[in-house]
A protein has these predicted regions:
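N-terminal hydrophobic/helix-forming segments and targeting peptides
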Residues: 1-438
């Protein structure tokens, strides 16, 4: 039997082809749950027991719940990212090859597995900036049709194709839009979809997206596959746990950042001041001045959630001999001696204790010592606002493929861990001592 949470997760991912859609979906869920939207440009008047959220750039969102007893409060923060590797459409997009082919000019966004994007129906999604009187407004766009394809080269024309793992993104990876087409065909499609005049379109952030829906599979329905599991699976798990739990003595925060796949160094990325700005403004509403803010941060805790690599069934040698993970065996704690992950002895102890209280299994991941792994958002966010932090994720295969695979049972484990976390209060009671209570 497929868990309700799994069905909800897959529907969530299917409906969110870009970071802009993911942020809009989270925003709509929060509004339905009674949260109030704040603008960074306006004065904030926060009340105990109320719930709020703020968006930045339409692609990052921070939500928080005010406790009712905030004499010695802490921030309980869990963070994930809204973006995934894909291809961004360039500003002057159309390439017309005589009167034979029309292609789109694209560039890689993040470190995708290029071959997975070939020979499958694709479309276009993102945001479009529209002129409406004196205002520029942002509109979500999804061209809900099979529109493009990146064709591979026939084996007869490239006999070394199966041996070549290298792709030139400017040559091999440009998508075919059609045969002979008039200039401006893409803009016409966009204007028709949004029901605006072409002249109203002032700008856009558009990406290729796959058309294939998420699936549950395996002889015991134990696996799920979808685009963008990294990292919408963690976004969904954090959001569910955040909405399901409450602690009167804490301020719970769910933070979803854009641009993790390209380094997080944007105004809406985890390396920006977004998290600091929001936490500081919350603290100023609780008690003016910086003293209570610094006290709260010292007792605070953060989960940085980004998926982890599972042992590959055909290549188990790629993973560490005993710090390796499997799908459907629980939440992964990620550790790195070079501090690409924030996990240390204290933060891992906290994660272990919370998991035990929640009845959630934990497993541990470290790279092979002779391999260089990826990085994530936790250590970048900690450079702006420093608190105890642990890096976690869910185990998956084919990370950065356009269609990834994970365990069907793990999302429930993440939700339960987040529920326990958000129901807890943290307090630094002595140097090197963190007390966890309800």
């Amino acid at each position: 039997m497929i868990e309700k949470e799994v069905q909800e997760l897959l529907s969530f991912i299917d409906g969110n082809p870009t970071a802009y859609h993911t942020t809009a979906s989270v925003r709509n869920i929060l509004l339905k749950e009674g949260f109030s939207e704040l603008l960074e440009s306006r004065r904030w008047q926060l009340e105990p027991g109320r719930s709020y959220f703020v968006c930045r750039n339409g692609s990052s969102i921070l939500a928080f719940r005010m406790g009712e007893q905030l004499e010695n409060y802490s921030f309980n923060v869990a963070a994930a990212h809204t973006d995934s590797p894909c291809f961004r459409i360039k500003e002057n997009a159309e390439i017309h090859m005589g009167r034979k082919y029309t292609k789109l000019n694209t560039e890689g966004y993040g470190g995708m597995i290029c071959s997975t994007w070939m020979d499958r129906p694709l479309s276009v999604a993102g945001r479009v900036l529209i002129k409406e009187n004196d205002a520029i407004t942002s509109r979500l766009l999804t061209l809900d049709r099979d529109l493009l394809m990146i064709p591979s080269v026939a084996i007869h024309m490239d006999r070394e194709g199966n041996d070549r793992a290298s792709y030139n993104k400017q040559v091999d990876m440009l998508p075919l839009l059609g045969g002979a087409a008039e200039e401006g065909v893409l803009k016409k499609l966009i204007a028709a979809e949004l029901q605006v005049a072409e002249e109203q379109i002032l700008g856009s952030d558009l990406f290729l997206c796959i058309r294939e829906k998420a699936a549950v599979w395996g002889c015991n329905e134990e696996f799920i596959s979808s685009g963008r599991l990294d990292d919408q699976e963690c976004v969904f798990g954090i959001l569910k746990g955040f909405l399901n739990a409450h602690c009167a003595r804490s301020i719970n925060v769910a933070a979803f950042f854009d641009n993790e796949e390209v380094g997080s160094g944007t105004k809406q990325g985890a390396a920006s001041t977004f998290l600091y700005d929001v936490l500081h403004r919350i603290a100023q509403n609780v008690c003016p001045g910086d003293e209570d803010f610094h006290r709260a941060v010292a007792s605070s805790f953060m989960f940085s959630a980004d998926n982890a690599h599972a042992v590959h069934p055909n290549h188990p040698e790629y993973t560490d001999v005993n710090n390796c993970t499997y799908m459907n065996e629980g939440v992964v704690v990620k550790v790195h001696a070079g501090q690409k992950y924030t996990s240390d002895g204290m933060s891992m102890a906290v994660a272990k204790e919370l998991a035990a209280r929640a009845g959630v299994p934990l497993q541990y991941f470290a790279n092979r010592s002779d391999k260089v792994g990826g990085s994530t958002l936790g250590n970048l966010a900690m450079a702006q606002v420093s608190m105890n932090c642990v890096d976690i994720g869910l185990s998956q295969l084919a990370m950065h493929s356009c269609y990834e695979t994970a365990g069907a049972r793990d999302i429930v484990s993440l939700i339960r861990l987040m529920e326990e976390f958000y129901a807890s209060h943290f307090e630094e009671t002595a140097s090197g001592t963190l007390t966890i209570s309800k």
